[in-house]
Amino acid sequence: MAKKIVSDLDLKGKVVLERADFNVPLKDGKITNDNRIVQALPTIKYIIEQGGKLVLFSHLGKVKQESDKEGLTLKPVADALSEKLGKEVTFVPETRGKKLESAIKNLSEGDVLLVENTRFEDLDGKKESKNDPELGKYWASLGDVFVNDAFGTAHREHASNVGISTHLETAAGYLMEKEIKFIGGVVNDPHKPVVAILGGAKVSDKIGVIKNLVNIADKILIGGGMAYTFLKAQGKEIGLSLLEEDKIDFAKELLESNGDQIVLPVDAKVAKEFSNDAEITEVSIDNIPSDQEAMDVGPKTVELFSKELEGAHTVVWNGPMGVFEFSNFAQGTIGVCKAIANLKDATTIIGGGDSAAAAISLGFEDDFTHISTGGGASLEYLEGIELPGIKAINDK
């Protein structure tokens, strides 16, 4: 069933509550990456243009004690948002109370107000994170309709997403709509053939995703640290490479039942120490020295993976191929990025997290159909789990 989106709502003159994802990195009170603010702009601008009175909610970081508040205020976000919109954004340094209620009452059509960090409510019995029913009801009482545009927290049942949705007509913002379309599309109705590329350090992080994707993907290419548990399951010697002993049986069973679908590295870049300056050797996957660790897939693996990608109509990628933060071990990730970017007739999706950071930092941002804004949310969505934040959005 299709979900309501913001353009389905009548917004003129209404107080529109919106859950955005402004969980941006800060250093000394300055925003170091404003990507999440930029991604939120289309929905915000649409609500303003339609004459809505916009009240924005977001969390920022984890608030565990009173002293955390100072470094986790949303004031820098209000300033950045004001600059990007070219208009004043009223910032209310509270999450409830008369000051907030009065500021909302004084809003005119097209005005924007940002409420303080929703997780300040976690200091009193984790009211935000545990979806306290009274808090959700109170926040909902401040507005007429609700727009959820925070995919990054869609896998969480919090007062500021699910709690508010319980009491108000709820629609997805444009960013949330894109995530439902692309990540949801991979899971529910992909254009075949589908190739999934999985990387990153741990098999344990991706077990649910693998179990779901074997029913969807024609091929699953596995790189990154997680590949070595699979190679060990095949009986290969992996030296000091990353290994999850307790996942060998899972890998073995998967290779036995779905071996035709799974493609593993054929070579690797190995080193004696975990450092960018380490001496690098390229070896066949059968020749990893006992005193060395695989830090990246090798050129033959990039070639093999590129070949497997040819002809794919849908590609979903989650997790880098090696220690891409070290430039000497980024070639595998760059190679896969290039191979995906060169596909002509494919829908190409990065499922958030480290692979999204890698693609953006390596300059491939514009070469993908969609780069997800969610880390944990993307993974759970790819597992086929119905996310609470999406479930709470009204159907059309």
Swiss-Prot record:
Its main location: cytoplasm. Substrate binds at residues 21-23, 36, 59-62, 119, 156. Pathway: Carbohydrate degradation; glycolysis; pyruvate from D-glyceraldehyde 3-phosphate: step 2/5. Keywords: ATP-binding, Cytoplasm, Glycolysis, Kinase, Nucleotide-binding, Transferase. It catalyses: (2R)-3-phosphoglycerate + ATP = (2R)-3-phospho-glyceroyl phosphate + ADP. Pfam families: PGK. This is Phosphoglycerate kinase. It comes from Staphylococcus haemolyticus (strain JCSC1435). The gene is pgk.
